[in-house]
Amino acid sequence: MLTATKDLVLAQSDNSWPTHFRASLYLGVPFIGAQLAQLAINTTDVLMVGQLGATQLAAIILATQVFFTIFIFGSGFANAVVPMVAQAQGRGDQVSVRRSVRMGMWVVLLYGVLTAPVLWMAEPILLFAGQKPEVAALAGEYLHIAQWAIFPSLIFMVLRAFLSGLERAGVILYVTLVTLVLNAALCYVLIFGHFGFPELGIFGAAVAALGVALLGAALTIGYIRRQPELHRFELFVRFWRPDWPAFGEVVHLGIPISVTILAEVSLFTVASLLMGTIGTIELAAHGIALQFASIAFMIPLGLAQAGTVRIGLAYGSGDMVGVKRAAIAVLTLGVGFAAVGSTIFALFPHELAGLYLDTRRPDAAEVLAFAGPLIVIAGAFQLVDGLQAIAAGMLRGLKDTTIPMILAMIAYWPIGFFCAWAFAFPLGFGGVGVWFGFVLGLASAALLLNWRFFRLLRRVSAAPAAS
């Protein structure tokens, strides 16, 4: 067993700074590319359905938000598999790798079954929430098909966690790029009825989403089965055999990850509602700034995933020096990339905002005037957002998820939301105040999570995992 991972352990024992920076980039770049490709898939759906009319556009935005909320919570269980695999691989325990991945698939399949009624009943739920009947009906129609994509999508996430833990991130990028191309083609053909296919409208977008999810899972399974060096893990042999301790660990680690992700996503949702109460122009400007911040966030998110893997591998092999250097490497890269992005945001805010606006429209100048300052603030926002995301990823590498969840929720809501509300309304800063609150909340999360990581590192260094 140890022989099978000899090369990996030797690579982990090379603690030179160039090795750590190279390894972080080697893992991080494919993760970043895959995140950007996934963002492009979601954008493609909205852009194409938007050509059908305002009602269809509103319906797919609602439907994808419902699906995304269910999916993002479930992805926490898949993310829990990453440190489990990385630590087991670091100590040369391929049996634990297999059990972690299998039970990860069990958990997400069970989660899919439990959440299926919510997706199936989306139309009455949306009607109860006050949505227009025609919009709720279309959203429900979309989700009746797209809901089945939750199963292959989450299976893909678990298998992605397996490959990530083995530092095989490149294939994840390739699979995501293939699904990006297929999604665009299927949407074009099925939504609008080209090449002899019927015009299915929003229903066609749902069929495309399901087809792409199935393809992503199938390609990943095919890759794993065709790689001789991965056969020793026997992921799909006796798949029905349970391992309840591993099942419990996936749930124990995954729920805090899911809650943390959901808490951050919901903060942005509520912030949009706050901006909407200030004014339509402010909400439009907020949407533009948030779009740029979301794109920039893909970089630290990819580095955070790389940090989880690198730290998990080093910790599993008992290499505390490697843990510390892996952490410093991803943090340094995160700050470096954020500094470049922040500089671009600060120098060209109006030019960036103009990419989303038809300057010939009478309200464009107003939106541009509001969006410019928000994009400048988004530069500071992406720095602290990146630092807190990377810190959360590093803590996951140590399998520490519960305390980070509590710290993050304190930073997001009692600090972030309260400051956003206070700056916007009592202090009278309006939309700019909402973003000031964002920055303070995420800066608090960055400080708390990094403090937690380095404090925990000092503690575990006295009793490493491999001892």
UniProtKB/Swiss-Prot annotation:
UniProt subcellular location: Cell inner membrane
CDD domains: MATE_NorM_like
InterPro entries with a match to the protein in the record: MATE_fam, MATE_MdtK, MdtK-like
Biological processes per GO annotation: monoatomic ion transport
UniProt main location, coarse: membrane
Segments passing through the bilayer: 20-42, 57-79, 107-129, 144-163, 170-192, 202-224, 250-272, 292-314, 326-348, 368-390, 403-425, 429-451
GO CC, any one term: plasma membrane
Topology relative to the membrane: Multi-pass membrane protein
Glycoprotein recorded as keyword: no
UniProt xrefs under Pfam families: MatE
Molecular function per GO: antiporter activity; xenobiotic transmembrane transporter activity
Chain segments annotated as coiled-coil in the UniProt record: none
Alphabetical keyword list: Antiport, Cell inner membrane, Cell membrane, Ion transport, Membrane, Transmembrane, Transmembrane helix, Transport
UniProt record similarity statement: Belongs to the multi antimicrobial extrusion (MATE) (TC 2.A.66.1) family.
Function: Multidrug efflux pump.
Name of the featured protein: Probable multidrug resistance protein NorM
